[in-house]
Amino acid sequence: MPWIQIKLNATNDNAEAIGDMLMEETGAVSVTFLDAKDTPVFEPLPGETRLWGDTDVVALYEADMDTSLILQQIKASNMLAEGFAHKVEQVEDKDWEREWMDNFHPMQFGRRLWICPSWREVPDPQAVNVMLDPGLAFGTGTHPTTALCLEWLDNLDLTGKTVIDFGCGSGILAIAAIKLGAAKVIGIDIDPQALLASKDNAARNGVEDQIEVYLPKDQPEGLVADVVVANILAGPLRELSPTIKGLLKPGGQLAMSGILDTQAESVAEFYRDDLELDPIAEKSEWCRISGRKLG
C-alpha cells in the first residue's frame, strides 16, 4: 500500500510542537525528525528532545487522505510562516528493515580490517573481520567519523595493549581493537542501550571476555590505557578533555572524531598542551584529531 509523505522545515524551537500537531490534528500515522543540513546534534539537557538546529519534520499519511485539507490544517495552526515550504510525495510500502539489511555491505578500512554485517559472508576469511549487528546503537562504519577511527586503529600496533573506547556505541571500535591485537578493551558510554549492543556484538565476535563496558559513573577508579579512541562530538570532546586526557597513560595514543572540519581547531586547543598532535585527517567534511600524550 502506498503512503503520502509531507515534509516541512522547522527549527529546534518548534519541531517537536509541529510533530505533535501533525499527529493530533492532521491524522499522521507517524512523524520523523530528520537533520536538514547534515549538522551534528549535541546531547540534550534532561527532558529535552534531541534535535538539530535546522530540522525536517516528515509526516506519513494513509494514501486516501486529502493532502489539500492537511495543508490547510497546517496553515491554520499558525505554527509555520505564511507560504511555508513543503514537499508532498507518494512513497511505496516496503520492508524497510529488509531494504536496510540488503544495502549494508562489508566494508574495508585500512589494510587489514573489514566490517561485515552479521547476515553476510565475509569477503576475505584471512582478514581481520568484525561481524556487526548495529541494533539500536550508533556505529556501523558507514559514517566518515567511524571510518576515520577504524583506519587509525588499523594503522596501530595494538598487540598486548589496553584500549578505551570512550563513547562505545555499537562496540565497533572496541571489537576492532581486540581483533587487531589489543589484550583488553574498556567501553564507556552514557547510554545503557549502547552497552547492551556492545556486549551483543562482542559475543557475536567471540571476544566478550576481553571487553568490559561501563556507564561513566560505574567505571573503575584510576582507569588508564595505552590507547584511547573517542568518536563522540566536538562539544563533549572540549568539555570532557580533562577526563579524556586523564584516561591516557604517558606516551599513550589518542584519536578523536565526531568533529566537523570547521570545529577541528577549537577542539585541538583543549589537547595541544598535553599531546603531541598529528596532522588532522579529513573525510567528507569530518575530521580526526590524534596524537601522543607527553610525559
Swiss-Prot record:
What cellular component terms from Gene Ontology apply here? cytosol
Record the organism: Vibrio cholerae serotype O1 (strain ATCC 39541 / Classical Ogawa 395 / O395)
The catalytic activity, as recorded, is: L-lysyl-[protein] + 3 S-adenosyl-L-methionine = N(6),N(6),N(6)-trimethyl-L-lysyl-[protein] + 3 S-adenosyl-L-homocysteine + 3 H(+)
Subcellular location field: Cytoplasm
Leading EC class: transferase
Can you say what this protein is called? Ribosomal protein L11 methyltransferase
Q: List the keywords (alphabetical).
A: Cytoplasm, Methyltransferase, S-adenosyl-L-methionine, Transferase
Q: Which GO terms describe its molecular function?
A: protein-lysine N-methyltransferase activity
Which CDD domains is this protein grouped with?
A: AdoMet_MTases
Q: What Gene3D superfamilies is this protein classified in?
A: Vaccinia Virus protein VP39
Q: What is its EC number?
A: 2.1.1.-
Q: Which GO terms describe its biological process?
A: methylation
Q: Which Pfam families does the record cross-reference, listed alphabetically?
A: PrmA
Q: What family does the Swiss-Prot or TrEMBL record give for this protein?
A: Belongs to the methyltransferase superfamily. PrmA family.
Superkingdom of the organism of origin:
Bacteria
Q: Which residues bind S-adenosyl-L-methionine?
A: 146, 167, 189, 231
Annotated function:
Methylates ribosomal protein L11.
